[in-house]
């Protein structure tokens, strides 16, 4: 109706009444109702567990356009659902049963990760009704600091401890190779390597 969100908007209407199709309708006086529409925040996809309970984990849609991205720390075969800001709950397509295809129908199953626990970069696209998981088994540092980073799964963060001889600037590069899982690979058929390109 073209109303402004988060402020009261007057909506005007009249009621029509008639006792039969062959009768002329009688109209009420104009009635004014103040309606305050609100904007639904569609920027977050809330990760639910297999019982559809909140987990505190979210994916982010920068443009609020139905594409949710983010890192997740998952155990092997972890099961989950995703809920949008408008309450729509997404799971795996229960009709085809194909992994990584999405559905918001009652027949949907939970999503599930492949059989490796660790760090995943998740891309869930409700418009394409498909999601993917880029498994990141390890990250290494090269440059002024060199070594292998450790993934803290419960807190979803990579760390590397080192001692600096003095205050100042250092330059390093983070490197890693990921395994992409999507509807074309299933949960155990990934044969693709993806350079993460994190610098």
Description of each model-found segment:
Residues 1-199:
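Insoluble glucan recognition modules
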């Amino acid at each position: 109706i073209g109303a402004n969100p988060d402020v009261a908007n007057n909506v005007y209407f009249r009621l029509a009444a008639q006792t039969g199709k062959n009768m002329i309708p009688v109209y009420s006086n104009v009635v004014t109702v103040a309606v305050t529409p609100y904007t639904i925040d569609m920027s977050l996809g809330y990760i639910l567990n297999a019982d559809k309970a909140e987990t505190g984990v979210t994916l982010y849609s920068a443009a609020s356009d139905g594409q949710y991205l983010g890192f997740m720390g998952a155990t092997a075969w972890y099961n989950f659902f995703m809920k949008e800001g408008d309450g729509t709950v997404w799971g795996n397509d229960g009709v085809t049963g194909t992994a990584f295809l999405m559905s918001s129908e009652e027949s949907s199953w939970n999503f599930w990760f492949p059989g490796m626990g660790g760090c995943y970069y998740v891309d869930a696209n409700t418009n394409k009704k498909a999601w993917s998981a880029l498994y990141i088994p390890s990250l290494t540092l090269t440059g002024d600091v060199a070594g292998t980073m450790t993934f803290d799964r419960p807190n979803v963060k990579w760390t590397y401890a080192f001692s600096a001889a003095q205050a100042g600037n250092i330059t390093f590069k983070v490197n890693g190779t990921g395994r992409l899982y999507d509807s074309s690979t299933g949960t155990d058929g990934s044969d693709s390597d993806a350079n993460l390109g994190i610098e």
